[in-house]
Regions:
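A non-catalytic, amphipathic alpha-helix used as a structural packing/dimerization or gating element
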Residues: 24-35, 86, 152-163, 203-206, ...
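NAD(P)-dependent Rossmann-like dehydrogenase/reductase catalytic/cofactor-binding core
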Residues: 12, 155, 162-173, 195-196, ...
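Rossmann-fold dinucleotide-binding core
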Residues: 103-173, 180-181
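NAD(P)+-binding Rossmann beta1-loop-alpha1 motif at the extreme N-terminus of oxidoreductases
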Residues: 1-37
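Rossmann-like NAD(P)-binding element
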Residues: 21-28, 41-104, 111-112
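A general alpha-helix detector
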Residues: 39, 139-140, 186-190, 217, ...
Length: 282
């Protein structure tokens, strides 16, 4: 997700510093931005961008494995895995490094913003900015105000989202916000229907697309997002709400524990997703 967000910012004329834990991951991120399924080369091929514009766009993106490279940024977006303690640790370290004026935004898909903001001093400059996959294509950004998010931080984030060509919609803080609460229940129910033998993976995907006009079905969507991410979200939602429709599916756990983390093109080290594990032809 981070590489897609970086692509959106760079294409909108912003200088970007992309930070990750290894040079190999960063190399793959740049490769995805340039030649991935939603990359810049595709835009050139479709006539939506010139080769010169693509070159300038790529030049706006710098990479680093050090948090020190972020010390002068104005706006920071965190995209680490959906793990509360990991996110808090990252923000606590960044809070010591980044200038005090910098706004911190989390791309968490469901962890309460107020529970993340406890890790930093700048609670008034902390906000949720929930993007959707694939970031270069999906227009919605869910903007989440924490308990101490200032009006200025909120307005800056809303306006920035619009400048990026996105549609920001404000929501209140709570486990899963709106979209994740809604979609997690849908995804877990789709898996349960498969487990009950009501319909197959491909058939469920096709019915959701044909009946509801969705661009992709639940199993295709889970493969795109990442099955490990979906599992983390479901576990968090169930732990926070104790509502049974969020309970993680045993089948989902089996795939994740077997190394099937989703689409191999976007998930480093994954053996594949639902269609690969069950050998279903698309």
């Amino acid at each position: 997700m981070g590489s897609g967000i970086a692509q959106v910012f760079a294409r909108s004329g912003y200088d970007v510093i992309l930070v990750d834990v290894s040079e190999d991951i960063l190399r793959r991120a740049l490769q995805s931005i340039e030649s991935g399924p939603y990359g810049l080369i595709r835009l050139v091929e479709k006539g939506k961008m010139s080769e010169e514009e693509m070159k300038k766009c790529m030049q706006r993106i710098k990479t680093s494995t050090s948090y020190e490279s972020l010390k002068d940024v104005d706006f920071l977006i965190e995209c680490v895995p959906e793990n509360l303690e990991l996110k808090r640790k990252v923000f606590a370290e960044l809070d010591k490094i980044c200038k005090k004026e910098a706004i911190f935004a989390s791309n968490t898909s469901g962890i309460m913003i107020s529970s993340l903001a406890v890790a930093v001093e700048r609670k008034d400059k902390f906000i949720g900015m929930h993007w959707f996959n694939p970031a270069p294509v999906m227009r919605l950004i869910e903007v989440v105000r924490g308990a101490m998010t200032s009006e200025e931080t909120f307005q800056i984030t809303m306006e920035l989202s619009r400048k990026l060509g996105k549609v920001p919609i404000p929501v209140n803080d709570g486990p899963g916000f709106f979209t994740t609460r809604f979609i997690t229940a849908w995804l877990m129910e789709a898996i349960r229907l498969y487990e009950l033998g009501i319909a197959g993976i491909k058939e469920i995907d096709e019915m959701c697309k044909l009946a509801f006009g969705f661009p992709m079905g639940p199993f295709e969507l889970m493969d795109l997002i990442g099955l490990d991410t979906i599992l983390h979200i479901a576990e968090y939602m169930y732990e926070e709400t104790k509502e049974k429709h969020y309970a993680p599916s045993p089948t989902l756990k089996k795939l994740v524990f077997s190394g099937y983390l989703g689409d191999k093109r976007s998930k480093l080290g994954s053996k594949g997703g639902w269609y690969d594990f069950f050998q279903v032809k698309k």
